[in-house]
């Protein structure tokens, strides 16, 4: 999908940008994936029980969970990222989230950090898949775009020095859209918080079959996390 340019970025040999179909570009934030980032502690503190780190990349969060004594498995589709994570001591598999995943139906927490709610370009479909992976009372922890950001489903690619990857589907979900996305996926209550300029949601993994669970997205619902 993103292949060689992504691997070069992880190895420090390139600084690719994400290009959108309208021609706009922004830097690929690879530095934050290679080391602890502000706000990581907040989402790690909410991981309970066996945790699946989806799109684990070079494995910083998978390693951090293991160091806390939390059983954690990372999955990623990029061989070099998997190798990096394993070299740091993480338990990681080369696996697509939509393929067969060990422990299906038994994970207590599923982690979609660093914008990985965008995987596949269809956030509701991704959350439906996550619900299959979770235990009945499990939860998904998801990183979001700030409030006011649109819900976008589009094609993007990586570009650097005249080279470009193939286009691939991706999505961006603003904090004030995640309740609707979770509802479309048939999931439960959404709790949103912010810390260190990052936005997150905890989403109940149990399927809702009748009444919609609403979270009022008013300014006082966006509360800074402590610690």
Regions found by a protein language model. Name each.
Residues 137-145:
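Conserved beta-strand signature within the Rossmann-like core of class I S-adenosyl-L-methionine
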Residues 107-123:
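A short SAM/SAH-binding and catalytic strip from SAM-dependent methyltransferases
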Residues 98-109:
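A short acidic, Gly/Pro-enriched loop at the edge of an enzyme's catalytic core
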Residues 1-46:
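S-adenosyl-L-methionine
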Residues 168-186:
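Short alpha-helix
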Residues 89-99:
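Conserved SAM-binding strand-loop segment of SAM-dependent methyltransferases
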Residues 78:
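Conserved SAM/SAH-binding beta-strand->alpha-helix loop
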Residues 124-136:
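A short glycine-rich, Lys/Arg-flanked "PGG" loop and its adjoining helix->strand segment in the class I
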């Amino acid at each position: 999908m993103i292949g060689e340019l992504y691997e070069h970025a992880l190895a420090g040999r390139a600084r690719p940008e994400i290009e959108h179909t309208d021609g706009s570009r922004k830097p690929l934030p690879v530095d934050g994936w290679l080391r602890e980032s502000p706000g990581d502690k907040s989402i790690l503190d909410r991981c309970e029980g066996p945790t699946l780190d989806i799109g684990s990349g070079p494995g910083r969060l998978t390693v951090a969970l293991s160091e806390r004594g939390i059983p954690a498995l990372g999955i990623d589709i990029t061989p070099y990222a998997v190798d990096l994570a394993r070299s740091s001591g993480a338990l990681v598999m080369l696996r697509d989230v939509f393929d067969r995943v060990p422990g299906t139906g038994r994970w207590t927490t599923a982690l979609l950090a660093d914008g990985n709610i965008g995987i596949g370009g269809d956030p509701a479909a991704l959350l439906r898949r996550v619900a299959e992976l979770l235990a009945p009372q499990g939860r998904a922890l998801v990183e979001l775009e700030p409030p006011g950001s649109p819900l976008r489903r589009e094609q993007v690619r990586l570009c650097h020095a005249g080279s470009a990857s193939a286009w691939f589907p991706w999505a961006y979900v603003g904090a004030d859209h995640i309740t609707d996305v979770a509802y479309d996926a048939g999931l439960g209550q959404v709790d949103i918080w912010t810390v260190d300029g990052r936005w997150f949601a905890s989403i109940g993994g149990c399927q809702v079959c009748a009444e919609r669970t609403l979270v009022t997205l008013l300014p006082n619902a966006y509360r800074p996390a402590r610690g």
